[in-house]
């Protein structure tokens, strides 16, 4: 034993929303056969998407690419009202793989709009979840802020009829700063009934923060277009620890580990455990012999499939409590 240790973050990897979204595509392929069309990558992970593509899933961005009467699945990130309307007009058989926690934000937007509140969204411009959430209302009806600096530039109709919602995969710490700035500038702004950042994002960021405090280097398994995976790397780096994000083990560089005794490994919510194990095997070959699991929050949430795709024993409620 050389004292070189790998610590695995807990929790890590797939969350309930990702599990559900992947299962919807797989079950639809089993029930209806290929091809099954999916608007956008069902989750942001190359390995997962490539695997589903091999099984017969076709990933598209424009509904014009989908033939009449075909089966269409919305990605876990959600879609706008305009996309839903177009899908209905084209007569597709639709299954909605939107994460229920994203759907919760969509419902909050509808409720606030019905109360004539102007809504601010905290999120990253261009991210598919942000496009879907802001697309719950007509273009221009919601305001987007990405940074604390954006808050000072906001022009609102009525500061007393104002509310905010958040993208579910943001940095917990950075979002707190933006929320503080919003509350400072608009004292009467309405906060969500419950934090929009999802339990899995929060738990994984807490775990990687603890990991970074113990380790000399942190490896995050996740694809470059995965928001929550990028945030994990940023959180670890923010502690002052060397942090790298890799899509799979082939992206690892041996030089990163020179002089590093403790290596932390985690994975974004859309990264499968098989990729973590491949990363682990590579690092072990390079001399880190001891592996141990870190401690963290236990997760037992399960989101069930749409009723049309459920099998015997797969019943409501949608949310099984932790």
Curated annotation (Swiss-Prot):
Segments forming a coiled coil: none
Family assignment from sequence similarity: Belongs to the IspH family.
Function: Catalyzes the conversion of 1-hydroxy-2-methyl-2-(E)-butenyl 4-diphosphate (HMBPP) into a mixture of isopentenyl diphosphate (IPP) and dimethylallyl diphosphate (DMAPP). Acts in the terminal step of the DOXP/MEP pathway for isoprenoid precursor biosynthesis.
Organism of this sequence: Neisseria meningitidis serogroup C (strain 053442)
Name of protein: 4-hydroxy-3-methylbut-2-enyl diphosphate reductase
Cofactor, how bound (note): Binds 1 [4Fe-4S] cluster per subunit.
Pfam families attached to this UniProt entry: LYTB
EC number, UniProt record: 1.17.7.4
Binding residue positions for (2E)-4-hydroxy-3-methylbut-2-enyl diphosphate: 44, 77, 127, 168, 226-228, 270
GO MF entry, a single one: metal ion binding
Active site positions, chain numbering: 129
Binding site for isopentenyl diphosphate: 44, 77, 127, 226-228, 270
Binding site for [4Fe-4S] cluster: 15, 99, 198
Biological process according to GO: dimethylallyl diphosphate biosynthetic process; isopentenyl diphosphate biosynthetic process, methylerythritol 4-phosphate pathway; terpenoid biosynthetic process
Record-listed dimethylallyl diphosphate binding positions: 44, 77, 127, 226-228, 270
Record Gene3D superfamilies: 3.40.50.11270, 4-hydroxy-3-methylbut-2-enyl diphosphate reductase, catalytic domain (3.40.1010.20)
InterPro entries: LytB/IspH
HAMAP family: IspH
Cofactor: [4Fe-4S] cluster
Catalysed conversion reaction: isopentenyl diphosphate + 2 oxidized [2Fe-2S]-[ferredoxin] + H2O = (2E)-4-hydroxy-3-methylbut-2-enyl diphosphate + 2 reduced [2Fe-2S]-[ferredoxin] + 2 H(+); dimethylallyl diphosphate + 2 oxidized [2Fe-2S]-[ferredoxin] + H2O = (2E)-4-hydroxy-3-methylbut-2-enyl diphosphate + 2 reduced [2Fe-2S]-[ferredoxin] + 2 H(+)
Keyword Protein transport annotated: no
Pathway: Isoprenoid biosynthesis; dimethylallyl diphosphate biosynthesis; dimethylallyl diphosphate from (2E)-4-hydroxy-3-methylbutenyl diphosphate: step 1/1; Isoprenoid biosynthesis; isopentenyl diphosphate biosynthesis via DXP pathway; isopentenyl diphosphate from 1-deoxy-D-xylulose 5-phosphate: step 6/6
Keywords: 4Fe-4S, Iron, Iron-sulfur, Isoprene biosynthesis, Metal-binding, Oxidoreductase
């Amino acid at each position: 034993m050389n004292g070189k240790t790998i610590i695995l973050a807990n929790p890590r990897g797939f969350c309930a929303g990702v599990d559900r979204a992947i299962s919807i595509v797989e079950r639809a392929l089993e029930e209806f056969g290929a091809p099954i069309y999916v608007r956008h990558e069902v989750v942001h992970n190359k390995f997962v998407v490539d695997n589903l593509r091999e099984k017969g899933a076709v990933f598209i961005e424009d509904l014009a690419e989908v033939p009449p009467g075909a089966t269409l699945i919305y990605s876990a990130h959600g879609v706008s009202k305009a996309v839903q309307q177009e899908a209905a007009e084209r007569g597709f058989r639709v299954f909605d793989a939107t994460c229920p926690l994203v759907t919760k934000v969509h419902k909050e937007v509808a409720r606030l709009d019905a109360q004539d509140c102007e809504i601010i969204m905290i999120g990253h411009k261009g991210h598919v979840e942000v496009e879907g959430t802001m697309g719950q209302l007509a273009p221009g009806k919601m305001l987007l802020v990405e940074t604390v600096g954006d808050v000072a530039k906001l022009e609102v109709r009525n500061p007393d009829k104002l509310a905010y919602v958040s993208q579910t995969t943001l940095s917990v710490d950075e979002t707190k700063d933006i929320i503080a700035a919003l509350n400072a500038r608009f004292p009467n702004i309405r906060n969500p009934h419950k934090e929009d950042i999802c339990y899995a994002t929060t738990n994984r960021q807490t775990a990687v923060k603890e990991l970074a405090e113990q380790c000399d280097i942190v490896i995050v398994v996740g694809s470059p277009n995965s928001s929550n995976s990028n945030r994990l790397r940023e959180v670890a780096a923010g502690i002052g620890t060397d942090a790298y994000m890799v899509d799979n083990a082939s992206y690892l560089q041996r030089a990163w580990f020179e002089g590093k005794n403790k290596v932390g490994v985690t994975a974004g919510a859309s990264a499968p455990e098989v990729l973590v194990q491949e990363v682990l095997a590579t690092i072990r070959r390079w001399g880190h012999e001891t592996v141990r699991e870190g401690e963290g929050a236990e997760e037992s949430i399960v989101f069930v499939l749409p009723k049309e795709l459920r099998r015997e024993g797969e019943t409501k409620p949608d949310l099984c409590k932790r």
